[in-house]
Structure formats: structure tokens, C-alpha cells
Amino acid sequence: MATSFCSSISMQAPFSATTTRFCLNKQATIFNNEKTNNLSFSLRRLMPARLAVSCAVKQETVEKVSEIVKKQLSLTDDQKVTAGTKFTELGADSLDTVEIVMGLEEEFGITMAEERAKEIATVQQAAELIEELVQEKTA
């Protein structure tokens, strides 16, 4: 998670005046070069921003992966599994993850390299890898 801060300095003249810009903490600040009556400083904290990056995978692939994960982990129908759900959040250990990968390979008719399979931690990551492998298989 990234947090950013903003600092600003402003001075105002009663009449129009030429201005000079400079950067303070990567924010543009304007100073008036003429006589000024007002000088103000303000610091404000900006809201933290979270970025999410994901590839466009078919919703049906995500749904199939979710179903297989629920089946392999013996989850009830009321337990929600979304694209961002981590296997560890569902109580899966490394053996469970291997079983999930085996179920995915069987369902989609693909073979995952062990190194690539170890990188899968979420439903989204599994769906992305599956679509990539299916494309490679058909190409």
C-alpha cells in the first residue's frame, strides 16, 4: 500500500503579479514575486491508494476454478470464493494446493510445470495460468 503526502505553500498579492513555480515534494507551488499580504502553509495527508492489476480472464474460467477449489477443500456452498481469494485464506496448505492444481489440470486438460504451479496463490492467478496454457496448447 502506498501513502502520499502533499505540502503546499501559497502567497497572495492584492494585485496581479508575476509568479514563480517550484516543486516541493513533487507538487507544484506558486510564489508571487510582488509584495504579498498573505502567506499560508498547509499540509494534508492524501488517502492511501491501492492498485490492483489483473489480466482479463474469462469469467467462466474464474467460476470453474472457484468450483474446483471449493470441491478440493470441501467448502460449503455458502462460503464465497472470488477471483482475489487466496488459497491460504481458505485454510489450504501446500498439499491442498497440489491437489487443487491436479484438479485444474484434469478439468482443463492441461499440464502445469511444477515451478509455475508453485506461483499460484489465488483463484485469479490460477485462471490466468490456465488460459495461458490452454492458448499455448491450441496454438
From Swiss-Prot:
Organelle transit peptide residues: 1-54
Q: Which GO terms describe its molecular function?
A: acyl carrier activity; phosphopantetheine binding
* Any single biological process term in GO: response to salt stress
Which residues, renumbered to this chain, carry the PTM O-(pantetheine 4'-phosphoryl)serine? S94
Q: Name one GO cellular component term.
A: chloroplast
- Signal peptide start-end: none
- Enumerate the Pfam families for this protein: PP-binding
Q: Where in the cell is it found?
A: Plastid, Chloroplast
By its UniProt entry, which InterPro entries does this protein fall under? ACP, ACP-like_sf, ACP_chloroplastic, PKS_PP-bd, PP-bd_ACP, Ppantetheine_attach_site
Q: What does this protein do?
A: Carrier of the growing fatty acid chain in fatty acid biosynthesis.
Q: Which family does it belong to?
A: Belongs to the acyl carrier protein (ACP) family.
In Swiss-Prot or TrEMBL terms, this protein is called: Acyl carrier protein 5, chloroplastic
What would be the name of the gene that encodes this protein? ACP5
